[in-house]
């Protein structure tokens, strides 16, 4: 359901129409300017959202709160009754609702999953935008695409988003580095190499020796990359594992250039040396018996984050097409592929009690040590691991393994924003971007209530989720 408001610009618009009808050229010009200004939010009214439960994102809650938005920014937040809307502003009574900061997916691979299939042929500007719109539909306001993007196309999409030509999650992307011609899982590797060929872009940077690795870092820094993603994984013996001398050279050069380095590592046992080398974070937690208290303490002392990334394994065998929450964005063709019986998926997937216990113990070690656990999904790295939806499922896994709902929400908001250096996202505080989600139910009571999305706002503007849903289901 969309919030209904009475827009006070209506009276002003009517007056303009009355006085300018006989001056058609001037009328057309002013109308174009008027709607441009409206589109850019320059004529937006202040909005007061009041009587809501406000989950700030830093672990605190305002049970009966209010938030004032002016243009693209949050300008005040506090107890209901203490804030009032500016003159000519609009007030929304959100009694019984919950406000949360917009969510962030800190590990994905956009562009390859399309409306009716997965692969390199989908990697177009239009599909990148579609993926970012799907993230926004599910309440995600930013996504980090980890080392599989053609930078030219990514920059074009970023520019269009900055110009507000569409509403979608913010896009961050990285230069991917690994031994030559290697890195992603073998299925995904073929698709990334195909995109390299079709676009002429350098997506996967092959590392051969330390000096060449340092030169590669200098080159990506000159191209204004902010992140590097390293693969340190032999893929079960099918690829060459990146040598310590190479990842040490990359991390050292990246730190000198002001770039952040995130790691796909094969085992938890790889983590100590990578932490010592200066890695900023791990895109796979390798949660289990090998990720013990000693590694957790080293992570904490070095302020290195961990993305558990557990849904990638759990959901690939589940009949997710039967989940109505995902069905909202699926084409009829794709829905039929994902229903019970298709691809040998099951409605209920049994989990190993031993593995579950090991993961719970590993999670507890990370939490007790104060490690920043961050939400990431690896969405898009394999077929039908869907954007946005998988983030909500990952939150459910976090809570199942021992996090509180509040801790899980912080992993998807303030902690993700901090490690991605998104200084205006992740919190509902004055001065931050007005990127937030209105929920019909309280996620602190049940984390699955993050699914109860009433509205999503990006830069102070509501996302038209109904139009997006109709568009996607019709494909």
Residue ranges and their predicted role:
Residues 44-46:
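Boundary at the C-terminal end of the N-terminal hydrophobic targeting segment
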Residues 94, 98-99, 103-116, 121-233, ...:
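Divalent-metal coordination cores built from histidine and acidic residues
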Residues 1-23:
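N-terminal secretory signal peptides that target proteins for export/translocation
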Residues 256, 343-442, 462:
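His/Asp/Glu-enriched, well-ordered alpha-helical/loop segment
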Residues 52, 412-414, 433-474:
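C-terminal cap of metal-dependent C-N hydrolases
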Residues 54, 58-100:
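Histidine-rich, glycine-flanked metal-binding segment
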Residues 114-117, 241, 271-277, 312, ...:
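Histidine/acidic-residue-rich catalytic or RNA/ligand-binding cores of hydrolases
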């Amino acid at each position: 359901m969309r919030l209904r408001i009475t827009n006070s610009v209506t009276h002003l618009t009517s007056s303009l129409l009355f006085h300018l009808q006989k001056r058609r050229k001037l009328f057309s010009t002013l109308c174009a300017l008027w709607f441009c200004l409206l589109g850019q939010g320059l004529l937006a009214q202040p909005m007061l959202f009041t009587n809501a439960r406000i989950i700030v994102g830093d672990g605190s809650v305002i049970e009966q709160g209010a938030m004032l938005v002016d243009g693209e920014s949050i300008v005040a937040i506090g107890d209901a009754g203490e804030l009032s809307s500016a003159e000519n502003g609009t007030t929304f009574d959100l009694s019984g609702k919950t406000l949360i900061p917009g969510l962030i997916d800190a590990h994905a691979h956009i562009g390859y999953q399309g409306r009716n299939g997965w692969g390199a042929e989908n990697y177009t500007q239009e599909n990148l935008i579609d993926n970012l719109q799907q993230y926004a539909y599910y309440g995600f306001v930013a996504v980090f695409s980890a080392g599989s993007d053609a930078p030219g196309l990514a920059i074009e999409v970023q520019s269009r988003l900055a110009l507000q030509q569409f509403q979608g999650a913010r896009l961050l992307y990285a230069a991917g580095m690994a031994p030559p011609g290697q890195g992603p899982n073998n299925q995904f590797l073929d698709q990334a190499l195909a995109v390299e060929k079709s676009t002429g872009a350098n997506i996967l940077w092959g590392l051969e020796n330390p000096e060449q690795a340092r030169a590669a870092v200098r080159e990506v820094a000159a191209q204004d990359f902010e992140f590097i993603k390293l693969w340190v994984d032999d893929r079960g013996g099918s690829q060459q594992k990146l040598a310590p001398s190479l990842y040490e050279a990359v991390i050292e050069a990246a730190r000198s250039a002001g770039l952040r380095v995130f790691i796909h590592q094969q085992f938890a046992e790889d983590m100590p040396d990578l932490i010592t080398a200066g890695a900023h974070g791990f895109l796979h937690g390798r949660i289990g018996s090998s990720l013990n208290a000693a590694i957790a303490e080293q992570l904490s002392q070095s302020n290195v984050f961990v993305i558990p990334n557990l849904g990638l394994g759990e959901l690939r065998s589940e009949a997710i097409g039967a989940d109505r929450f995902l069905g909202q964005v699926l084409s009829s063709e794709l829905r039929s592929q994902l229903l019970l019986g298709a691809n040998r998926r099951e409605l209920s997937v049994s989990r190993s009690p031993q593995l579950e216990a090991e993961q719970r113990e590993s999670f507890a070690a990370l939490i007790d040590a104060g490690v920043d656990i961050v939400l990431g999904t690896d969405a898009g790295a394999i077929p039908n691991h869907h954007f946005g939806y998988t983030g909500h499922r990952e939150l459910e896994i976090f809570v199942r393994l021992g996090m509180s709902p509040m801790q899980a929400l912080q992993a998807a908001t303030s902690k993700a924003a901090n490690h991605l250096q998104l200084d205006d996202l992740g919190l509902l505080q004055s001065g931050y971007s007005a990127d937030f989600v209105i929920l019909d139910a309280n996620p602190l009571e049940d984390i699955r209530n993050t699914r109860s999305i009433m509205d999503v706002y990006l830069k102070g503007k509501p996302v038209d989720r109904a139009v997006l849903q109709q568009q996607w289901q019709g494909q």
